[in-house]
Design a protein with these regions (language model features):
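Membrane-proximal helix-turn-helix segments that form the acceptor-binding/catalytic region
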Residues: 24, 95, 99-110, 125, ...
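A short, well-ordered alpha-helix in the C-terminal region of glycosyltransferases
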Residues: 367, 374-389
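Conserved acidic donor-binding segment of nucleotide-sugar-dependent glycosyltransferases
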Residues: 345, 350-358, 367-373
């Protein structure tokens, strides 16, 4: 290892919304590297959440752009708006990728790191520019940015610029990682590039030490509990299919959804939800990253209802399915390429169904809740899969090996 080598991680999100960056920074810091994370400040609330995370870290965090009310924030928002409009009119502007791309590049350049690692659209664009300037760079593709939206949603997205970033970094960056074998192989094939190192989006097994048995979500009825989590509760996330499936599940269930939900969509869910079958629906706000595992672990079955489209969603492995395993939940997941990869390594912990197939979803839910033995076996398999494969303790060595190869 290159002792005291300085690594700068560049991202376009807050730490509290970017656990992969937090885990990466922590692993590199523990390995002896000097680590700086460069990312934006959107508002005071998210900044406070970031600071809470940083109380237990030794690595440095710096603002790439401050979007709170100030001249810098106003200018960054204006450039983003102009860049998006320009792209919609047929141009290609990096400012359409996110806020503060120019200031992020300028501040990254001033750090003078031995290695820069780009995350998300802004971060990967920045390290692409630094590569041209002779810097040593790496990239993490948590998503396939050119294929992470449906066609109707790509207006204003600078796809040509993103393709250049992906192609160049996959071919020429010295350290490239992604979240699944399915995504790694697809991107490598598309760009005729080396296959990236796969680092699963896992969480530390040690996080289980903080779990307690005090329920915060469950209603105390003893009914089996289903849990679904995402940043946003809304259409196109499998919830309508879940409502149809529960019509064919005779055993009364409690269903817990966690995320930001608009009142009008909450009303639509209530209207669809089959409460006449004895099921109850609970909608919870998001909680801090430190609280999430404890909330997940209260429940019996986790729902990972991803879609085949866009392609990035089909190929990647999201945080939620691995968080469910770490929480000791049986999992019902749609059979995307990424989630098949998890199911293959998780024995009987994960049952698969096609997206929008309510009959099969109902059958897989019934499989887990038909008896205590069925559920306990699946939950035991989930914990074993988390401990042996899908935990950060198992994934971090792959990251460190790749970095050591670059900096030796």
């Amino acid at each position: 290892m290159a002792t005291n080598a300085h690594i700068c991680i560049v991202t376009g999100s807050h730490l509290c919304r970017n656990p992969r960056v937090v885990k990466e920074a922590g692993a590199l810091d523990e390995a002896g590297y000097d680590v700086t994370v460069l990312g934006p400040v959107f508002n005071d609330d998210l900044r406070a959440e970031d600071r809470a995370l940083l109380t237990e870290t030794a690595w440095d965090h710096r603002a790439s752009v401050d979007l709170r009310p100030c001249i810098e924030g106003t200018w960054a928002r204006l450039r983003r708006k102009i860049g998006t409009h320009w792209t919609r009119w047929g141009g290609e502007s990096p400012h359409a990728l996110g806020y503060g791309v120019a200031s992020t590049l300028r501040r990254a350049r001033s750090i003078g790191a031995d290695l820069y690692i780009g995350h998300e659209e802004v971060g990967t664009w920045v390290v692409r520019q630094l590569l041209d300037e002779g810097a040593r760079v790496g990239a993490d593709f948590e998503d396939w940015h050119t294929r992470d939206l449906l066609p109707k949603d790509r207006v204003g997205r600078p796809l040509g610029l993103l393709e250049d970033v992906e192609r160049t970094l996959l071919r020429h960056a010295e350290h490239v990682t992604t979240t699944s074998k399915a995504l790694a192989q697809a991107m490598a094939s598309t760009y005729e590039a080396p296959v990236p190192t796969v680092i699963y989006n896992a969480f530390p097994w040690a996080d289980r030490e903080a779990l307690n048995e005090t329920p915060r979500d469950r209603d105390g009825s003893g009914r089996p509990s289903l849990h679904w989590v995402s940043q946003t509760i809304g259409p196109g996330r499998g919830l309508e299919t879940l409502c149809r499936a529960l019509q064919d599940v005779e055993r009364p269930m409690q269903v817990h959804l966690r995320g930001q939900c608009r009142p009008d969509y909450h009303d639509r869910l209530d209207a669809r939800f089959p409460s006449e079958n004895g099921h109850d629906l609970f909608v919870h706000d998001l909680v801090s990253p430190d609280e999430l595992l404890g909330r997940i672990a209260e429940h019996d079955v986790g729902l990972a209802l991803e879609q085949y489209e866009p392609e990035s969603r089909n190929r990647t492995i999201t945080n939620k399915i691995l968080h469910y395993l770490l929480g000791g939940l049986a999992v019902v997941a749609t059979d995307t390429d990424g989630q098949r990869e998890v199911a293959d390594k998780a024995d009987g912990a994960v049952r698969l169904c096609a997206p929008d197939d309510s009959d099969e979803l109902a059958r897989q839910i019934r499989h887990f809740v038909r008896s205590e033995n069925s559920l306990e076996r699946a939950q035991s398999d989930a914990l074993r899969a988390a401990r042996e494969t899908f935990s950060w303790e198992q994934q971090a060595p792959r990251l460190l090996t790749s970095i050591e190869t670059v900096l030796r």
